[in-house]
C-alpha cells in the first residue's frame, strides 16, 4: 500500500528508505554492565559494618525522597497540570500563564498520550513499512531564496497585541499675566470684587476697584474690615506681584492730597506722592490708617502697642448698613398686603429704628459686649423692671418720638410690664414650701405650676401651655391612683434572709488553708500592716477591755461585747452575759427600703421576717483576734493576719468601715496585695475620712473592684442599721452588746455597690457608717466663727460656699462681726456680677446688721432676724445651686422664719415659751467662742511683736552708731502702735529684765552691755515680754 508523505502543505512522491532498528548503540556513557561488580564483604570484617550502616542510611533517604515526591505530585498535580496546559497571555505589558480548565487539561492529556504512542511506535520500528508519498508542486524554486513554512498539526495562530489609541490632552496655552490683566480690566469697569484663592482657606486675597469721586482706584480687603486688628495685615511677598497688575487699571482723574485721606479710604492703593506722610519704602501705598498723623501702609508690621493707637480708616457705616439690610430682609413678614413705596428719607428711618432699639434694649453702645450681655443674665422680672425704669426716665423723649412716629405708642405699651394677676401670694409661697425638696414627679409638677401662677400675666403663652399639660398629667395620675391608695405601701414587703450561706471560693480553696483548715494570709498579712499601723488601736487584754466597751458617736453610742471575752465559770453570770442591752425597736418604714425605678432593691433593704416585721439584731458575741464575715447563715471566722501573736486591734472611731476593706483583702491575689493596701491607705482613707456616708463608701468599693475585680465577690462583715441616729455599724470581732438594730441584707461587695447609684431612692444611702460627725449646722457655724479671724478662709467661703455666711443669722453677734470686718460687703461685691439674688441676700444681711446695732434688747434683735429670714428664704427659692449646703440653709431659714408666728400662737393659747432663755444661752455660747478666737488672735499678734522687737534691737545695736538710737526708738514706738493698736510710750531696754539672772551666759551679756553702756535699749511691754519668755524659755535669752 503506497503512502504519500507531506512536507507541510507540499505533498511528495519520493519513496522513503525502510526504517531499520538499531541494535547496537555507540555511547560514551558508562552503563551498569561496564561498572565493576561490587563484592559484599563479610560481616565479621572491619569494613563490613560501616558499609552496612551507610547502605541502610542511603536506602532510608531515598525512600523518604520518593515518598516526598509522591506526596508532592499527589498534592500539586492538579496545579501543575493547569500550569502545563495553560496559555501564555499578555496583558498590560505583562506576560503570564493563564491556568487551563478541566476540559483543556483533558484535551492536553489526550494529545500527549497520542504523541507518546506515536513516539513509542516510531522507536520500536513499527513504522518501517510505512511509505509516505508526497507531492511537489511545480514552479517552486528554492534557489530563489523563498521561505518555506512547515506548519504542523499542532500549529495555532499567535495573539496579536492590540495597540491602544491615546487621546492627546488639549492644553490651552496662554499667558497668566495677560489673563489676569483682562480679568482686572473687566473688574475695573464694573467695580466687581475679585477673590484670589490660595492653597489654604486663609490664603484668600480679596481685591477690586472703587469709585472715589470720578477716579477709579484699586483696593484690598484688609483684616481690620472684619474687626481683626493684627500687627501686619498684608505680607509684602504675597502682594508683590499683584500690586503692579492692579495699578495698571487705576485711573486718577481728581486732585488728591494727603490731608484728604480719611475714613473710608482703608485698603486703597495710592501713589506715594498722594500719601506723602507715609515714610515707607514702597512706591505704592496700601492705606491702613494713621498713626501719630502719618499714613500707615498695610504691609508694614506695627508693634503690638501701636495697633490699638492706630486710627483705622475702614468705613463703619457701610458695614452697619450691610448688616442692617441683611438682618432686615431676613425678618421681613411672610405676608405682603400691599406694594411698598418709599415716602420717608433715610434719616427718618434711622431715628425710628434707634427709638425701637433703645426701648427694647436700652444701652450706651450697641457694639459693647457688656451692654449686650447684661440682658442674658437678667430674669424676665428684672428685664421688665429695667424697661419700666428706662421708659419712665426717658418719657419726654419717647413722647416726642411718638408724636413723630405714632406707631411707637403700641410698641411702648407692649414693652410695659403688666401687674401680677395673682394677689394671693401667701398661698403660692406656702405651696412652694410644701413642694420644696421633694423629688417625686407629681410634687415637681405642682411646683412648676405654682411658679407659673405666681407670674400671672407676665407668663408667656408657652408657659401657660406647659402649666395646662402638667395639670392634665397630675389629674390623670390622681384618677389612676384614687382607687389604689394602699398601692406602694409596705404591707406586702418581704425581704427574708437567705437560708443558704454565701460561697466564697477564696476561703474554700485548699491551697490557701493550713493543716487546721484556717485561711493563710501569706503576703496579704504582711501588707495589711498598713491598716493596723495608723487606723487601728491596740487593745490591752484584761482591764483594757473596759476602755472600748462604749463606742461613742456624736449622735449616739453603742456598746461592744468585748467585755464578754472575760468568761466567768459561774453559770448564772454567764447567762446574764448573754443578755444584750436593747434599744428602741423601730417598725418597718420607708427608711428601711431602697428603690430603683419604683422597684425594690432587696440587697439594699433591711431584712424582714416572714410576717413582714423587721429582723432585730441580737447580741453578737466577741472573738479574739478574728475577722468575722458573712451576713447570712452562720458567720465565718477568719484569723487576723499573724503580725503579732498576742495583740488585738480595734478600729479607731470613725474608721470601722476599714473592716470592709480588710474583708475584701481576703479575695485579693497575693501579688496585688501591696497595691491594694497602698491604694486604700493613700487614696481611699483620705477621701472618705471619718464617718463617711454609705453612698461614698459604696463608691469607694466600686473603685476598688474596678482595679481588683476579684474583690466584688468578697463577703462583708455584718452591718447593723440604726435608724434613730441614721447610722450603720460595721460589726467587728468584738461583737455588739446593744441589740434591737435592723440588719442590712447586702452580703458582698457587689451588692453594697448598689448604694453608689444616684438612681437609688432611699434614706439609707445617706446614713453614716460608724457614726455621725458633727451636725452640718454646727460645722457651718464653727467654720464661720474661725473664718472671722482668718481672711483666706473667709474669702474661700465667700467664693465657694456663700451659704455659710447666711448661718450667721443664728446669732446677732455673728452678723455684726461679719459686718464690722467687711465680709458682707465683700460677698455682695463678689456675687453681684455672678448671681444678683445671692448678692441681694448679703445686702439684706448688711441692712439687718445696721438695724440690730440700734436695738438694745436681745429679743428685739431676734425679732429682726426672724423677719429678715422670711425675705431671705423667699429669695433663696429662686437661686441655683451655688454650694453644697443650700438645702441645709433653706431648712434653717424656714425654721427661724416660722418661729415668730409659732411663738405667737403659743402665747395666744396660754402655753409657756422658753425661746428667750434659749436665745440668751445660745448668744452667750457664740460670744464666748468669738472672744476666745479674738484672744488667740491678740496672743499671736503680741508674740510676733515681741519677736520683731528683739530681732530689731539686736540688729540695731550691732550695726548702727549711737547717735541714731533716738530715731530707732521712734520707729519702735510707731511699730508698737500699729501692731498693738495703742501707744506704749517711749520704749526702753533693760538687760536685767530681759535676761534670766541664773542663765549660764548672763555674766557674758552683763560685760557686753557694760562696754556698750552708751547705747539705748528697748524695754518690751511687761505682758508680751513675760508671755514670750514663757513660750520660748531659754531661747529668749539668746
From Swiss-Prot:
Which terms does the record give in the GO molecular function aspect?
cysteine-type endopeptidase activity; serine-type peptidase activity
What modifications follow translation?
Answer: Potyviral RNA is expressed as two polyproteins which undergo post-translational proteolytic processing. Genome polyprotein is processed by NIa-pro, P1 and HC-pro proteinases resulting in the production of at least ten individual proteins. P3N-PIPO is cleaved by P1 and HC-pro proteinases resulting in the production of three individual proteins. The P1 proteinase and the HC-pro cleave only their respective C-termini autocatalytically.
Protein name, as recorded: P3N-PIPO polyprotein
Top-rank taxon, per record: Viruses
Which one GO biological process term can you cite for this protein? symbiont-mediated suppression of host innate immune response
Q: Where is this site: Cleavage?
A: 313-314, 770-771
Peptidase C6 domain residues are 648-770
Q: Which residues form the Peptidase S30 domain?
A: 170-313
Q: Name one GO cellular component term.
A: host cell plasmodesma
| Domain notes from UniProt | The N-terminus of helper component proteinase is involved in interaction with stylets. The central part is involved in interaction with virions and the C-terminus is involved in cell-to cell movement of the virus.
Catalytic residues (UniProt): 224, 233, 266, 656, 729
What are its E.C. numbers?
A: 3.4.21.-, 3.4.22.45
What protein family is recorded? Belongs to the potyviridae P3N-PIPO polyprotein family.
Top EC category: hydrolase
Q: Where is this motif: Involved in interaction with stylet and aphid transmission?
A: 365-368
Any Pfam family from its record, for instance, is Peptidase_C6
Q: Where is this motif: Involved in virions binding and aphid transmission?
A: 622-624
Keywords for this protein: Host cell junction, Host-virus interaction, Hydrolase, Inhibition of host innate immune response by virus, Protease, Serine protease, Suppressor of RNA silencing, Transport, Viral immunoevasion, Viral movement protein
